[in-house]
């Protein structure tokens, strides 16, 4: 794994302007998180699970952080579960009007004068481009934010909660428990939905495909992956320095690694927050690749 080690060092030189620090063994992930937290301020929480070795790395993993747009794969998983039960149809057309549009809706704002969008198109838009109106329409199809919370409880997640709609849910006020999760809960739920028995094989494949096609995440974990590694992910961002990503990563010829990274309560720039996640991603590659 010498090539990955060199890749990790090169990435840190690129994103920080310094050589990779001397970090011991498995602590490379946690030390990288602590260094990023010290530099950015606020809090960073992670939960990483190598499903092949069953090793875990947690830091502030049971502290609450704003969900932001990381709720979107969970919402679409709830839709897929409803489709399996016969309560929804993937190709049902949802009509909407200009008054339904909210900030950052790159797909739905171009379709508002058409006959609407299918449930499948809405999930694709809200996961791959983080379209906020599409996210709201998916939530509406479920019965609102509380219905997503109820779904999370059915899969064993007693922590994650959604209370508001886009874009209010991105407020991220420190200490506000609304619209929050913990890194541990988010990682476990993602693993359950992409690998567990909650969804059928076909639904798991569909959710994975949507997340693999994420088009707004290149500067984060994807920038840290060597050639041949696969990733399915979803990012989030909000007020008070909130930035997040949930992901499943497949090293070549290995079992997947589940990752949840959340940050909050900092004054760092958007680019600096992205850089920190890329650094943590490089540390994860360095650790699980050995």
Regions found by a protein language model. Give the residues of each.
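Mid-domain, small-residue-enriched loop/turn segments at the edges of structured enzyme/sensor domains
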Residues: 43, 118, 123, 136-198
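Bacterial N-terminal signal peptides
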Residues: 6-18
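Soluble periplasmic/extracytoplasmic beta-strand elements of cell-envelope proteins
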Residues: 45-49, 58, 74, 95, ...
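Structured C-terminal helix/loop/strand segments within mature extracytoplasmic catalytic/sensor domains
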Residues: 26-39, 52, 140-141, 145-146, ...
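Short, well-structured active-site flanking segments
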Residues: 81-100, 145, 149, 200-204
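Short, conserved catalytic-motif segment at the N-terminal edge
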Residues: 40-65, 88
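Active-site SXXK
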Residues: 54, 66-94, 126, 259
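Acidic helix-start/capping segments at beta-turn-to-alpha-helix junctions
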Residues: 51, 90-107, 142-143, 210
């Amino acid at each position: 794994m010498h090539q990955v080690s060199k890749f990790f060092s090169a990435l840190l030189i690129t994103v920080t302007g310094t050589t990779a620090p001397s970090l011991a063994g498995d602590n490379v992930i946690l030390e990288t998180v602590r260094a990023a937290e010290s530099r950015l301020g606020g809090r960073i929480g992670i939960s990483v699970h190598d499903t092949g070795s069953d090793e875990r790395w947690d830091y502030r993993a049971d502290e609450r952080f704003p969900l932001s747009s990381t709720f979107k794969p969970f919402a679409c998983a709830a839709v897929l579960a409803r489709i399996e039960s016969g309560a929804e149809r993937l190709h049902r057309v949802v009509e909407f009007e200009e008054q339904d549009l909210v900030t950052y809706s790159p797909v739905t704002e171009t379709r508002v004068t058409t006959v609407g969008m299918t449930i499948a198109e809405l999930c694709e838009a809200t996961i791959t481009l983080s379209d906020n109106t599409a996210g709201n329409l998916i939530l509406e199809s479920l019965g609102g934010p509380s219905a997503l919370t109820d779904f999370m409880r059915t899969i064993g997640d007693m922590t994650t909660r959604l209370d508001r709609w886009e874009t209010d849910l991105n407020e991220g006020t420190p200490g506000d428990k609304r619209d929050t999760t913990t890194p541990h809960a988010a990682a476990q739920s993602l693993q359950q939905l992409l690998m567990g028995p909650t969804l059928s094989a076909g639904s798991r494949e569909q959710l994975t495909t949507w997340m693999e096609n994420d088009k707004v995440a290149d500067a984060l974990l994807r920038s840290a992956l060597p050639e041949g590694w696969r990733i399915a992910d979803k990012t989030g961002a909000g007020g008070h320095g909130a930035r997040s990503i949930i992901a499943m990563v497949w090293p070549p010829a290995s079992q997947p690694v589940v990752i949840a990274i959340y940050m909050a309560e900092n004054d760092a720039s958007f680019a600096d927050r992205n850089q920190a996640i890329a650094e943590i991603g490089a540390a994860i590659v360095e650790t699980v690749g050995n």
